[in-house]
Amino acid sequence: MSKASLKKTLAGMDADQLRHLVIEAYEARKETREYLEYWLEPDSKTLAEKFRKDIRAVFFTGKEKPKAKAHPRLSEANKLIRDFRAMCYDTEIVADMLIFLAETEADWLSYKYYRRSWYPSVMRYRQEAEKYVETAGLEALYSERLRHLEKNINILYRHI
């Protein structure tokens, strides 16, 4: 359904029908529930903490040990970042979350002895974070952290 047809359909509904639709969507989808809760009470820091835990869980067990048998599902981490960016409009917190993802993957790699094939992945996340930081004009806030991350990634690459 296109946006135009959605608008047309919603315009034809009365207040009770709209209320019912929103409640159904709230109950049906976790993402919708999170979005509506954030929309009603925007608290970027609490939202960021929740997503930090979820991203960390992609790479580590509950006891902060790297997941042993399976590789982390980067598609899951990417989805978390997409969902976070869709909800949070605070550029500083989004930049922090992008850097956190790269730091978490680098941290996971420091525990594991994987092939060099993981290096491009962690560098891609770092570069994406750096590009976002530059676009948002937050270099003064995050340039040192990005340099430190790149240094750590390069040290890991030499030891793999």
Q: What is each residue range found by the language model?
A:
Residues 1-40:
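Basic helix-extension-helix modules of the SAP/HeH family
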Residues 5, 34-160:
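Eukaryote-biased, non-catalytic alpha-solenoid scaffold regions
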